[in-house]
């Protein structure tokens, strides 16, 4: 697949899938932090905590469009993504400060990039969130039970407004998975790897970034030499299907 200009599926990802056999349900607790830019306030009335609780963790029939249901269905009932939503918290800097004309993904621009935004989000949430509840990747699936790795497993930083990929405006943040410059100690664990999406992002974007949390690679064409897997994969253009 690398010859086609798309990522190679990591061997460890395949091993992890093999280890999930037997039909046992893995419950992964995710943390969603809602943050707004001072120059771009969120539409908290329409996109408050209840909206994102429903979008991310809503239950109901499997044909109900939620991130939890998507992964429960596609894992044949073996992965249940659950969690909590906090915010909106107001960031100390503007959207353009963090985007810095590059969608926020300039790796030499810290703190003027999305890493700085994620770090600020963690600090804003620190007084209100017990981050240790979201380190639950050990064999027993119980947070802080002694068999976890000491890192928050799934951290979503949802910012107000739209995104670079949806508008073509590099003054907005691009949705992605990344990590902070250094692990952030909080409640006895570390916040480090995060994903970020926009307030207006569709479910497909959240599911795509959750795929990265689980170890899935991008399968779209990253160097424009092929079509990649196009609409046939969530990790390619399928993430744009809504």
Regions found by a protein language model. Give the residues of each.
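Active-site-proximal segment of zinc-dependent metalloprotease catalytic domains
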Residues: 1-241
């Amino acid at each position: 697949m690398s010859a086609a200009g798309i990522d190679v599926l990591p061997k460890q990802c395949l091993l992890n899938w093999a280890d999930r056999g037997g039909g046992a349900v893995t419950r992964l607790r995710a943390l969603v932090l809602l943050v707004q830019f001072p120059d771009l306030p969120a539409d908290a009335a329409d996109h408050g905590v209840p909206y994102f609780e429903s979008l991310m963790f809503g239950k109901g029939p499997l044909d109900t469009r939620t991130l939890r249901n998507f992964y429960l269905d596609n894992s044949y009932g073996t992965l249940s993504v659950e969690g909590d939503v906090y915010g909106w918290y107001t960031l100390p800097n503007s959207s353009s400060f963090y985007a810095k004309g590059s969608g926020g993904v300039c790796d030499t621009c810290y703190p003027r990039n999305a890493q700085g935004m994620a770090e600020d989000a963690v600090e804003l949430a620190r007084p209100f969130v017990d981050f240790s509840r979201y380190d639950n990747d050990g064999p027993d699936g119980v947070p802080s039970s002694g068999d976890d790795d000491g890192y928050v497993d799934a951290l979503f930083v949802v910012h107000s407004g739209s995104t670079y990929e949806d508008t073509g405006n590099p003054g907005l943040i691009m949705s992605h998975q990344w990590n902070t410059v250094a692990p952030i100690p909080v409640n006895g664990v570390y916040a480090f790897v995060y994903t970020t999406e926009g307030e207006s992002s569709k479910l497909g974007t959240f599911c795509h970034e959750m795929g990265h949390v689980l170890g899935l690679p991008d399968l779209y064409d990253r160097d424009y030499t092929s079509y990649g897997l196009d609409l046939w994969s969530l990790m390619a253009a399928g993430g744009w299907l809504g």
